[in-house]
Amino acid sequence: MRGMKYLHTMVRVTDIDASLHFYRDALGLELLSRRDSEAGRYTLVFLAAPGDRSAQIELTYNWPAPDGSAEAYTGGRNFGHVAYAVDDIYATCQRLADHGVTINRPPRDGRMAFVRSPDGISIELLQAGAALAPAEPWASMSNVGSW
């Protein structure tokens, strides 16, 4: 190590099950670890792209208060986004769509797409290497919402 190493990006989530469905099941990240803290009333989940633990995402879920009220998070585009390189942008977007995820910015150019997590975190997907040739149905799809 040269004095510093990137570890992870942490995002707060409001529903750990919906978030795991999105990040693990739909997006295809691998679950590295999960820690449920009864005393601290929180859950920490670490995930990473398959075969690459060097860039991890930490999902932090703060359990509801004893009265049942959940913590609300507000954010905006000032956070920016989390980005992943994928082997096949079209197959990745199709898998996400098959899991009910809206493709906010379809990969019309065969290179880039955006989706949002259940908590509204913008996720950029970039085709690894050269862009794929434009293909339907993606090439003619319009943007949906903000990304």
What do the predicted segments below correspond to?
Residues 19-24, 96, 120:
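Conserved active-site tyrosine of GNAT-family acetyltransferases
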